[in-house]
């Protein structure tokens, strides 16, 4: 590989001084880091003399794999002693210190636990559910013990109430979570109260100089910038020359205040507002309409914004005099100190509880490791173990991790790699200040060396150029953490892309016309998704991309496309609309508790606990499980209009007029009562399993868009309930309440992961996409407002700037935000905006070849004004105040392009090619969005008013013999299992009838087992096969697969005793120990199981009677496959009982099915060959190679 000059400098670095590698997106930092380590090995060093810290376990595994690959390549290149040395390194690699800092911290604890008196028999508290329950118990005990304390009661009054203390508990948890990531948690907790100790006055000390005064200056400066812009604008408007003097007076007013503010005297600032009012507005002198439009659209808003910004200084800060603020600060100090004391008490109790139970959580691991490292003898011993300490993703470490790494290094062997522009984990307490400080110091030549890698080997030049055009005007040290210019900018360095490959950045804006009469159902969200769907349809099959592996152009396919989103909130809409367009989709992990399929089960549990809840009851009845429509629900309501809906349902089940509906509801009530009895006598996990079995809900959701993910989510709910049961968390009501409290915990309740390599468009959040790259990227919802929730609430807290609270007067109960809260909240907002800016950078730099941006605006005129901030034209970066005033990515992108002179503000739509940057902007409305026009045209044709009947024409139509009758009877969508009979008899068209909405509606529920009295009911072959497949899916092929292991696996995953007993363990053990099972074990790293796929197949390839090539969408789930030496082996489990001619019947029945699987894998992996197709006949213990 040809390395750049800076890459070679990193690779050749000798660890006799600290090095910071600032590696931009796509700069090959991991490749360079691997090569650096390899070159150190060639110099005679050993891999076990390196500490390599990664951000995630997955990154550590990738690092090891790539190092192994590089060492193996070196072994083939080298000879003699050097070759033997590399072979030794290969043996040492698995035990090398390559992993997360969590794992390294545990290594320290395991060896030196006695230094801090830790019990070595501890257990890792890895289960977040278990930790949450333990936190809840300790917090409840802590509060119960303090209710007699007057200070605690005053604290409770300030943040909660005696009857509802959860708000205060949440504040304690938040402070504890932040403290856990500091090297000295108690010291940090004490420090956050410092801003309330104002003995020297309000305009003295660090609170004034570092927080309050800069923010007042910022507001005044914002007003000044806007006024100067307005003044410059009216100089060219003859009718508005009178405004020049008015604006000059306003400019003088604001400049005067800035001067007073620099005097550090609160009273003088207050007096200035009292004695100097805003000047009286001027009047225009003419009737030039063009000038009037310009003034109204541009100048007038700037004047208003300037006035508002200036007056906010008085309304937010100067409405109280200094003595009043000092009095509130003094009283608030007592509240803050009590909150800190309460947090410390909880921390101490929680630590004691964990020691009592011999538990350690991950934060303990790093805290204890840091404490051990404070022992000088131990610290020096650990330092002596490593020749070099390397850390990847350095921008995302926290204060505690920084201190651990600094202590482990010897002061001159610290190798740090990262990109400040990609620091996006503030919600995990990551602190980019560590990177920023070293970047500044090293750039000035103090403390270490800085090497910048700005060459981008990922993206085509159009992506890199567009990203630079946006961030050149947006990011600087003040907002973003780094000045985006020079070596920091991306430099497209991939010379493999064809020179004639002309791709442009594509910006699409949906124009929401509030005055139009369009359907309210057609909203911005749907419109943006429709735009993306239409563009994807236009791309796939009709466009080509450059394949970087083959070095050739090839047709663009679905898996080349990824849609990035800021959050998971649009995913259901994306799935629904994409289904209409027949676009396969793969959605990455979100919060599974909030997904549709899980919410229905949670609603079911709610009404089992208490059926007198209208919303969850109607949700269950309306769901596909029972399939009631609005008319049926309304009819049930009429049975009892005075009481709740459940009472009406009970009445209807007795006297309903629709006999079918009455019978259905009577059966529902019997079933509900049965579930209530199960809930009373069994664990929650048993109840959930029973619901799954009775309703076939998991099987139904498998047929929906994203079926495999939905099934995984339902299984995750079952496993979560199992975890709670294992931790002695009992009671349906308590379970429901607990889940409701944690519904917003996206990080703790991520969806079960699915394979992203399927032939489908991928959808994921920007966070999930970090570190990945995709040929085509769509970034949607550009106009989504930047989230600023953590700068609101009763308490705001920041690592560097302390805590801000609302003060509640103990007698009057009047609530007022402290001046500290106002200042800290503003600082938090700045950090939020900076992180969102870095998130936008991550999103844009995921694209390799094409970038599509989609957003909306209520009025294009408002959007244009939002983008036009001429205050900053000619400056290197847009004014800080303008960037902070932006509320979305869309605002930032537009104002950056406008201020760079790339786009015209009189009409933003169009194709732009300027300064080597090419992009286009398109606007859409409800009439112009692709496909919507066609749909609406069809609807209008169907709704045409009848004016007469042409009988001759009608007869001709009715007598018409349709030549494609057979084709019209075919379903457009099939599951592979439904095609099984076609493979057995290609002439058969007897496909299973499918309801168009595929609803498993229950018209008559089965008789409950306790009524029928059939205690000997056998497990069905279907249930047995499903259970067997589930166990085979869960097997860890790296473990010894014996009877004990399988019984434990069954116990964890199959709650029903009879189903457990029906699984034939000897057949699974036979398979695991077979020659083929041994192959799977060897290929465990590439093994994929339960992989869904969807593909289009010409109908005539399935049905011999059909002539058309129209495609049929086939969906299926492959039991498993693995890749070895570039060849794919796929396999499928079968539990059929055939007896005679076992092998031939399995071949006959399933060869077509596996051929489809092979075709699907060939489309997913176009460069790999499917070598073998294996049917695993479990009943006959036969391996059948097709």
Swiss-Prot record:
Give the protein's cofactors: Mg(2+)
Short name of any one Pfam family annotated for the protein? PDDEXK_1
GO cellular component terms, semicolon-separated? cytosol; DNA helicase complex
GO molecular function (one): ATP binding
Identify the residues that the record assigns to the UvrD-like helicase C-terminal domain, covering every copy.
Answer: 487-771
Q: Could you tell me the Gene Ontology terms of the biological process aspect for this record?
A: double-strand break repair via homologous recombination
- Give the catalysed reaction(s), semicolon-separated: Couples ATP hydrolysis with the unwinding of duplex DNA by translocating in the 3'-5' direction; ATP + H2O = ADP + phosphate + H(+)
Record's keyword terms, sorted = ATP-binding, DNA damage, DNA repair, DNA-binding, Exonuclease, Helicase, Hydrolase, Isomerase, Nuclease, Nucleotide-binding
Annotated EC: 3.1.-.-, 5.6.2.4
PROSITE patterns membership = UVRD_HELICASE_ATP_BIND, UVRD_HELICASE_CTER
Entry-linked InterPro entries: AddA, DNA_helicase_UvrD-like_C, DNA_helicase_UvrD/REP, P-loop_NTPase, PDDEXK-like_dom_sf, PDDEXK_AddAB-type, Restrct_endonuc-II-like, UvrD-like_ATP-bd
Q: Which residues does the annotation say bind ATP?
A: 23-30
Question: Which stretches make up the UvrD-like helicase ATP-binding domain?
Answer: 2-460
Describe its partners and assembly state.
Heterodimer of AddA and AddB/RexB.
| Protein family membership | Belongs to the helicase family. AddA subfamily.
HAMAP family in the record, alphabetically?
AddA
Q: What does this protein do?
A: The heterodimer acts as both an ATP-dependent DNA helicase and an ATP-dependent, dual-direction single-stranded exonuclease. Recognizes the chi site generating a DNA molecule suitable for the initiation of homologous recombination. The AddA nuclease domain is required for chi fragment generation; this subunit has the helicase and 3' -> 5' nuclease activities.
Report what the protein is called: ATP-dependent helicase/nuclease subunit A
């Amino acid at each position: 590989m040809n390395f750049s000059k800076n890459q070679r400098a990193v690779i050749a670095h000798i660890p006799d001084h600290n090095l910071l590698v600032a590696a931009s997106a796509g700069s090959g930092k991991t490749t360079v880091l691997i090569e650096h380590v390899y070159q150190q090995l060639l110099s005679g060093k050993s891999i076990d003399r390196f500490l390599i810290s990664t951000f995630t376990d997955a990154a550590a595994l990738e690092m090891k794999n790539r190092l192994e690959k590089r060492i193996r390549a070196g072994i083939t290149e080298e000879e003699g002693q050097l070759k033997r040395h590399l072979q030794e390194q290969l043996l040492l690699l698995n035990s090398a210190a390559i992993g997360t800092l969590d794992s390294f911290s545990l290594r320290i604890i395991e060896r030196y636990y006695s230094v801090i008196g830790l019990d070595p028999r501890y257990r890792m508290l890895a289960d977040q559910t278990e930790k949450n329950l333990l936190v809840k118990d300790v917090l409840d005990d802590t509060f119960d013990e303090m209710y007699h304390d007057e200070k605690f009661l005053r604290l409770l009054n300030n943040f909660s109430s005696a009857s509802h203390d959860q708000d205060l508990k949440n504040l304690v948890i938040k402070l504890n979570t932040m403290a856990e990531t500091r090297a000295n948690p108690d010291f940090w907790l004490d420090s956050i109260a410092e801003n309330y100790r104002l003995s020297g006055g309000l305009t003295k000390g660090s609170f004034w100089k570092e927080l309050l005064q800069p923010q007042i200056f910022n507001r005044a400066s914002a007003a000044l910038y806007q006024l100067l812009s307005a003044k410059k604008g009216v100089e060219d408007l003859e009718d508005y020359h009178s405004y020049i003097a008015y604006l000059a007076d306003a400019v003088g007013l604001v400049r005067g205040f800035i001067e007073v503010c620099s005097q550090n005297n609160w009273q003088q600032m207050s007096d200035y507002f009292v004695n100097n009012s805003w000047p009286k507005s001027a009047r225009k002198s003419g009737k030039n309409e063009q000038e009037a439009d310009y003034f109204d659209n541009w100048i007038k808003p700037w004047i208003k914004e300037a006035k508002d910004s200036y007056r906010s200084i008085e309304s937010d800060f100067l409405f109280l005099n200094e003595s009043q603020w000092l009095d509130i600060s003094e009283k608030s100090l007592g509240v803050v100190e009590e909150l800190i004391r309460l947090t410390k008490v909880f921390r101490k109790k929680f630590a004691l509880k964990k020691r009592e139970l011999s538990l350690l959580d991950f934060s303990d691991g790093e805290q204890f490791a840091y404490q051990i490292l404070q022992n000088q003898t131990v610290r020096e011993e650990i330092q002596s173990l490593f020749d070099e300490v390397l850390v990847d993703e350095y921008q995302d470490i926290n204060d505690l991790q920084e201190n651990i790494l600094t202590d482990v290094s010897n002061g001159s062997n610290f190798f740090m790699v990262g990109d400040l522009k990609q620091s996006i984990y503030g919600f995990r307490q990551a602190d980019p200040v560590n990177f920023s400080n070293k970047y500044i110091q090293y750039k000035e030549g103090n403390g270490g060396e800085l090497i910048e890698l700005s060459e981008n080997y990922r993206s085509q030049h159009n992506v890199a150029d567009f990203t630079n055009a946006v961030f050149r005007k947006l990011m600087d040290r003040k907002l973003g953490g780094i000045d985006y210019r020079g070596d920091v900018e991306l430099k497209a360095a991939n010379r493999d892309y064809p020179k004639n490959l002309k791709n442009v950045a594509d910006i699409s804006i949906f124009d929401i016309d509030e005055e139009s009469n369009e359907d309210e159902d057609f909203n911005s969200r749907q419109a943006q998704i429709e735009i993306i769907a239409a563009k994807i349809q236009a791309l796939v099959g009709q466009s080509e991309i450059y394949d970087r592996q083959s070095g050739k152009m090839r047709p663009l396919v679905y898996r080349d496309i990824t849609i990035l989103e800021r959050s998971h909130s649009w995913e259901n809409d994306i799935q629904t609309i994409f289904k209409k367009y027949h676009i396969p989709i793969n959605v990455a992990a979100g919060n599974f508790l909030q997904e549709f399929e899980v919410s229905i089960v949670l609603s079911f549990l709610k009404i089992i606990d208490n059926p007198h809840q209208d919303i969850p009851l109607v949700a269950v009845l309306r769901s596909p499980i029972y399939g009631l429509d609005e008319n049926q629900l309304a009819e049930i309501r009429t049975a009892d209009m005075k009481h709740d809906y459940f009472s009406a349902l009970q009445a209807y089940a007795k006297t309903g007029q629709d006999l079918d509906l009455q019978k259905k509801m009577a059966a529902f009530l019997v079933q509900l009562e049965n579930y209530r009895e199960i809930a009373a006598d069994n664990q929650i996990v048993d109840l959930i399993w029973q619901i799954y079995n009775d309703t076939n809900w998991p099987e139904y959701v498998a047929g929906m868009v994203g079926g495999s993910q939905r099934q995984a989510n339902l299984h995750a709910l079952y496993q979560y309930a199992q975890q709670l049961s294992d931790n002695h968390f009992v009671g349906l009501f308590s379970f429901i309440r607990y889940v409701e409290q944690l519904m917003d915990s996206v990080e703790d309740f991520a969806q079960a992961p699915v394979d992203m390599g399927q032939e489908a468009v991928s959808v994921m959040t920007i966070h999930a996409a970090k570190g990945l790259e995709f040929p085509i990227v769509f970034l949607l919802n550009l106009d989504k407002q930047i989230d600023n929730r953590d700068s609101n609430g009763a308490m705001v807290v920041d690592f560097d700037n302390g805590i801000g609270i609302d003060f509640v007067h103990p007698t009057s109960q009047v609530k007022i935000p402290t001046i500290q809260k106002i200042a800290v909240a503003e600082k938090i907002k700045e950090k939020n905006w900076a992180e969102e800016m870095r998130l936008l950078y991550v999103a844009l730099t995921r694209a390799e070849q094409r970038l599509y941006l989609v957003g909306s605006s209520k009025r294009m005129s408002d959007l244009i004004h939002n983008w036009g901030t001429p205050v900053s034209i000619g400056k290197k970066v847009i004014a800080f105040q303008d960037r902070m005033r932006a509320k979305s990515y869309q605002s930032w992108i537009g104002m950056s392009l406008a201020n760079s002179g790339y786009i015209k503000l009189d009409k933003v739509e169009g194709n732009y090619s300027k300064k080597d940057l090419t992009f286009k902007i398109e606007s859409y409305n409800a009439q112009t969005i692709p496909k919507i026009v066609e749909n609406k045209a069809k609807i209008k044709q169907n709704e045409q008013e009848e004016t007469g009947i042409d009988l001759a024409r009608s007869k001709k139509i009715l007598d018409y013999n349709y030549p494609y009758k057979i084709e019209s009877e075919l379903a457009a969508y099939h599951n592979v299992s439904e095609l099984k009979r076609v493979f057995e008899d290609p002439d058969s068209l007897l496909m299973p009838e499918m309801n168009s909405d595929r609803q498993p509606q229950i018209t008559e529920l089965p008789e409950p087992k306790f009524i029928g009295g059939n205690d000997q009911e056998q497990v069905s072959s279907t249930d047995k096969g499903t259970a067997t497949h589930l166990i085979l899916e869960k097997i860890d092929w790296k473990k010894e697969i014996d009877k004990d292991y399988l019984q434990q696996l069954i116990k964890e995953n199959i709650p029903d005793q009879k189903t457990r007993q029906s699984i034939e363990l000897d057949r699974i053990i036979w398979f695991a120990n077979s020659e083929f099972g041994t192959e799977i074990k060897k290929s465990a790293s590439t093994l994929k199981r339960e992989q869904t796929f969807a593909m289009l197949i010409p109908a005539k390839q399935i049905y011999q009677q059909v002539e058309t090539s129209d495609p049929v969408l086939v969906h299926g789930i492959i039991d498993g496959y693995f890749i070895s030496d570039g060849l794919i082996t796929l396999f499928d489990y079968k539990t059929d009982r055939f007896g005679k001619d076992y092998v031939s019947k399995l071949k006959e029945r399933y060869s077509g099915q596996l051929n489809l699987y092979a075709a699907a894998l060939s489309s997913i992996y176009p460069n790999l060959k499917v070598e073998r197709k294996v049917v695993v006949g479990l009943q006959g213990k036969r391996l059948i190679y097709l």
